[in-house]
Structures are given as structure tokens and as C-alpha cells.
Amino acid sequence: MAETVFDKIIRGEIPCHKLYEDEQVLAFLDVAPLSFGHALVIPKERAKTLDLLSDDSAAAIGRVLPRLCRALKHITGVSAFNVLQNNESLAHQAVFHVHFHIIPKPDEKSGLGVAWPAGKLDAGQGAELAARIVKELAA
């Protein structure tokens, strides 16, 4: 995996507005925020995409993410927020180190804007897909 700006932030070579840090996780304010309070939560483990992250680091992120969401809601006074995580360029990942965005949504125009055409899941396709995924998880 190529070095990223996040590796340099983790090592302290690039400064950040740190919100939280432990042995496995670092959280800091985004320098190009979509809204006031936009934060990033990253594992210290180097992994390009979420599927490559260890279960241990994923669990550490899972313990920290809700706490940071609560703190951001309280401090910004915003009740609505998005948690966003992208994997690979096609899915809009720009920094190739797993990271989660917490983006406060104070109004319709600020924060993350999301619109997509909802599809319809065919019952037969859904049953077949679910069975295949369950089998893969058991492997």
C-alpha cells in the first residue's frame, strides 16, 4: 500500500486538529469540511479499504465512532449527521487509507448531499443473493 497523508498525520509529520487518539484509532477535523464539525475517524492500521481492515481495528473504530458522533452533535448543536465511508476510486475514495467521515447536517444545503434512484429487489434474486452471502460468511 502506498503511503498516504493519513500515515503522515498518524506519525505527527503533518499537524491536525486532533479530537481523539488511542493505540488503534485517530480522529481529527477535516481540513476541507462539508460542514462545521466535519471529522475523520481512521484506524492506525494501514488498510486501503474496509474489507482489508482487521476485525480488531474495525471493532476499535466501532467503539469510537458512536462516541464521536455524540460529542459532535452536542458541541455543534446539530441533531442530523451522516457517517460516510468510501472504498476505491469508483466509490469516490480519495485517500487510500480506510476512513470514516462524520458530517454534521445543519440544514438542507450544508453537509453531505445524497440522491440516488432507488431500485427494487426482486424476491427471488434477494433470496438467492442472501443465501450466497450467508454461505460466504460461514466459510
Which residue stretches match the model-derived regions?
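HIT superfamily nucleotide-processing domains
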Residues: 1-139
